[in-house]
Amino acid sequence: MAAPLLHTRLSGDVTAAASATLSASRTGLSDMLALESDFFNSPPKKTVRFGGTVTEVLLKYKKGETNDLELLKNQLSDPDIKDDQIINWLLEFRSSVMYLTKDFEQLINIILRLPWLNRSQRVVEEYLAFLGNLVSAQTVFLRPCLSMIASHFVPPRVIVKEGGIDVSDSDDEDDNLPAIFDTCHRALQIITRYVPSTPWFLMPILVEKFPFVRKSERTLECYVHNLLRISLYFPTLRREILELVIEKLLKLDVSVSRQDIEDAEEKAAQTCGGTDTTEGLFNMDEDEDTDPEKKADQEQPNQMAHPTAERLDVLLCLLLSYIEDVCRVHGKIDNNKTKDLYRDLISIFDKLLLPTHASCHVQFFMFFLCSFKLGFAEAFLEHLWKKLQDPNNPAIIRQAAANYIGSFLARAKFIPLITVKTCLDLLVNWLHMYLTNQDSGTKAFCDVALHGPFYSACQAVFYTVVFRHKQLLSGNLKQGLQYLQSLNFERIVLSQLNPLKICLPQVVNFFAAITNKYQLVFCYTIMERNSRQMLPVIRSTAGGDSVQTCTNPLDTFFPFDPCVLKRSKKFIDPIYQIWEDGSAEELQEFKKSTKKEVVEDEDDDFLKGEVPQSDTVTGLTPSSFDTHFQSPSSSVGSPPVLYIPGQSPLLTRIYD
């Protein structure tokens, strides 16, 4: 039976790692001093030698006599080498460490390949002492030592051969893996005591040793787990480690679409019938004494049918666990630690996530972090707002920022209405300023290549109103309507830039139904005209140009569409605003009774034709329509930057 997966949550391990880190800082020094004391106070044990002591063998090699060295290497390479033999050799090498120069690189490599981790505690302690002595005396071997340690951050491979043919190559399910990993981290800290610059040399090795993303989820989980542990006692590496982990997560994320994941789950459900559902209902016992086979069955409902989604889910769950464990101390959010982690993650977000189109799940690490305190959510929104309104940013970045703003405002249950209103005010005022700048220009026509950020901001506003209109109108309906009327949607919708033509049809349909119901603006006439203009217009039948009046569609995706990863969504669901089907049905009924002049076929399009399978906006994905986006370096007529440090309407508040 396979050993249980390493804590999908870092709980025990981050706790173990944190305690190991703290204990390393408290007891690690005394342990290492004790090892040194043992070394200096106890002479090497008597052992069988071929040609003398290790020191004599090394000195002979310097004189050109290589036979004894070859005998020594052969003995060290013996697969049946015993614990006592290893201890005796290590004691000898520690006493000869000053002679182990670069000339003996091959010998050192053999020593580093010794199977020391699964040996007795005496072997482990002696080997750790040897590593400390070696790197302190011969820093040239620092990289090989670090590389050896990093290679043990994944389960060893077990190869079964029959007739000289490999018939099995899988992870070794060793129950001692946690203890092995603990020893590896202890080794890193011992080496760092002797060579303080170790973290600087370690990071490139961690990048190099990262398993290929198509490796098993267990291999990936173990390696990422150990990387995150390293960030606890090497805080200077945290940002680089998190960037490495998120970069690998992103590669997995963009390689499998939400639709692929859902199709695989549906196919698996059809194959299994009702069996999995029954097991999921009754396997609720969490008793630690449960039989391992039954325990594995209990975990089965969390497994993703798509192999790439399974890897992504395991790793994202690990990252979310890490974020929570770093930020939450004794059950409460530690403001300072969360601030520091936020700074690291927002820089990674800017570098990796914001320029990446159509990632479905990785970005939820920011969503989750921002849920800890309102101040972090507001800081994130203001950060995105600055990206959107800055004309010096590439249009594609500004559009992505708008997508994130709209999706975050719509989906984050922890964002209060006052913050939603503040953001709507900022966005709508910016849209009106943009239109004012276009009134005197020569490019006031519908073209996504020219006005991409404008259309993305429009869509963010429409999307937010669709999700939040009930809250905006709840309580005092009159005041709510007055607020929505003050946004002057009519000017935006009726402008020459014609955002209803560019924005995603699903969003436009819902927005039109809401604004029509409350008589804010009547969109259907414009939508009907836009639908007619989508037809090609033939200018000449005698070799003339064929003119297609439709412009390129907006390259849209909503970053915080529902998470479909089974483990990770347990972190997200409690703080996530789902789309209420009742709202769609209510608007659908209202639309049927009020929209007379639009063609009849559009009635079905409101929830069926243009809205995905779930009949809600939640299904909007990057694959909703073909993309022909052209992104200029900046859009024309952008309003001046509104943000003034210390005077922004959206304050970045980090609450105590």
Curated annotation (Swiss-Prot):
The modification Phosphothreonine is found at T198. Residues 631-641 have a biased composition (Low complexity). Keywords: Nucleus, Phosphoprotein, Transcription, Transcription regulation. One of its GO terms (molecular function) is RNA polymerase I general transcription initiation factor activity. Residues 265-304, 608-641 are annotated as: Disordered. It is found in: Nucleus, Nucleolus. Its main location: nucleus. It comes from the Eukaryota. The keyword Phosphoprotein applies. Phosphorylated at Thr-198 by MAPK9/JNK2, which abrogates initiation complex formation. Part of Pol I pre-initiation complex (PIC), in which Pol I core assembles with RRN3 and promoter-bound UTBF and SL1/TIF-IB complex. Interacts with POLR1F, EIF3L, TAF1B and TAF1C. This is RNA polymerase I-specific transcription initiation factor RRN3. It comes from Mus musculus. The gene is Rrn3.
